[in-house]
């Protein structure tokens, strides 16, 4: 069942927010939002609400793992953010619902205009009452000259089970287009029973010290973080098992040798944190998928099932 709430007001707002001159900024921009509400009925997770404004929406849910756990693809037809664009995604899972959310392609934040209008993306995910939530988007590419800001907020409870990752590529080295100017800020917050549990903020300027210093990106162009919680059964043992399995993975080891992939696996109490640096996105994606395959059975109780869209 898919109930979409498209009111006359939303349709009017969509027309108002199509590309054109903004009364607020004077810039050409999109302002788009997507609100999802999922619940469980008769052992089936359904998309109860999918309300959108602007060029942001979802396809119908796919159920490759059965009725309990849909895969939901979030679509942004323009493909990227230009000057003044703002995107907000809100998803709430209720009453034991389960879901995997992903995107079909890389997100992009393009060069801004001469006035430096910011491009902003905010994702708020509430899984406090959910059985499980997975947020596994494709990478975000930050173009030279962008003025981007991204925020991820996870609202959880002590009983929550979730895996979330973000991968960010600064510039396009393969096209000889490094991130030489502009700025990018990325904030990740986790609330646990409404109290702060995890906070991380990355603030970079083109060719600033954060790119080369040991405390920063160490000369790499791509970075990512994977967060998995909450591990109730021997979190330190689970962490060590995951670390040893990744170290023994010959495919991951080869990426470190040939692609300069660097990673570290730590934990904050029962929250497991995997961080990675590289010159390319693909090695980090492979690392995260390997970690996801290891952590998913322990946290969610099922084997990994990659979304079909990843293979296209």
From Swiss-Prot:
GO molecular function: nickel cation binding
Domain of life (superkingdom): Bacteria
Coiled-coil segments on the chain, per record: none
Places the protein is found: Cytoplasm
Disulfide bonds: none
The entry's keywords: Chaperone, Cytoplasm, Nickel insertion
One GO term describing the cellular component: cytoplasm
InterPro entries registered for this protein in UniProt: UreD
HAMAP family: UreD (MF_01384)
PANTHER family (UniProt xref): UREASE ACCESSORY PROTEIN D (PTHR33643:SF1)
Quaternary structure annotation from Swiss-Prot or TrEMBL: UreD, UreF and UreG form a complex that acts as a GTP-hydrolysis-dependent molecular chaperone, activating the urease apoprotein by helping to assemble the nickel containing metallocenter of UreC. The UreE protein probably delivers the nickel.
Family, per entry: Belongs to the UreD family.
Task of the protein: Required for maturation of urease via the functional incorporation of the urease nickel metallocenter.
Annotated protein name in UniProt: Urease accessory protein UreD
Biological source species: Hahella chejuensis (strain KCTC 2396)
Lineage: Bacteria, Pseudomonadati, Pseudomonadota, Gammaproteobacteria, Oceanospirillales
Gene behind the chain: ureD
